[in-house]
Structures are given as C-alpha cells and as structure tokens.
Amino acid sequence: TIIQFAVETGMRRSEILKLQWNDINLNTGIASLYDTKNGDDRHIPLTKKAIKLLSNFTQTTEFVFPISANCLRLAWERCKNKSNIKGLRFHDLRHEAVSRFFEMGLSVPEVALISGHKDVRQLFRYTHLKPENLIAKYSNIF
C-alpha cells in the first residue's frame, strides 16, 4: 500500500513516513505536509485512488504509515529481491508519479505544487514521459 500511495502522491519517502492522520482531510482530498525537504509546507490534492487507499486503513496510531525508515528500506529490498528487480530505488516512485502527472495533462505549475519542486529544471529531471502514453492526447490535438 505504501508503494501505491507513493506513486499516487509523488511524495518523498520522508514525507510519507512523517504523514499523520491529522494532516489528511479525506473530505476535501488534501494532504498537508509540514517542514518538507525544502523547508516549506505543502498542501497537495490526493487522487481518488490515494483517498481510497487511506480510507481502507484503520487509524490505530497518529502516523498513517507507522514504520521506521529502516523498516521501509528493508521491506523495499525484500520486495525487489522477490521480484528480481535490480537498481530500483524507492525515490524512483516519485519520478514515476511526476511523469504520470504530466501524462494526465497537468501543467508545470500544478505538478510543481504537488511535488514541491521550486526549480523547473529539477522538476523536468523527474519527468520520464513515455511516447506511447501521449498518443491519445496527441491525437486529440491534431
């Protein structure tokens, strides 16, 4: 679930692990992130899938994902080993999310708001668009 949530939100691992239930409003679909990597607070819209993932959780602790960074790292390594995947970092899920946001048609300012990137050049480093995913959008324009 934490992997799906990471891809749906584009949040950093540290932001996901610090996320508390009182930071989330499932009615408005907004997650509030405080003291992020760049020092700013950020309020991000959640996708329907992210809201559904969170709605299926039982709130037993103040943290949405009550695990340590080390526990997540070890679980990530186990998942990669079981799947025989080499070289994939948890942070790559953030790259995937940013690429998906652009493929959904979100603008640069919208994706920057969600991801927290202040520098557009850095944001574009996270973007790995797939031509096959843009065919339908391209067809609608011409």
Regions found by a protein language model. Name each.
Residues T1:
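P-loop NTP-binding/switch modules centered on Walker-like glycine-rich loops
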Residues N27, D40, Q59, N84, ...:
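Exposed loop/turn and edge beta-strand positions of beta-sandwich/beta-sheet ligand-binding modules
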Residues S32, V64, R89-D92, Q122-R125:
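Conserved beta-strand positions that form and line the central face of beta-propeller blades
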Residues D35-G39, K49-I51, N70, V108, ...:
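Catalytic-site neighborhood detector that most strongly recognizes the C-terminal catalytic loop/helix
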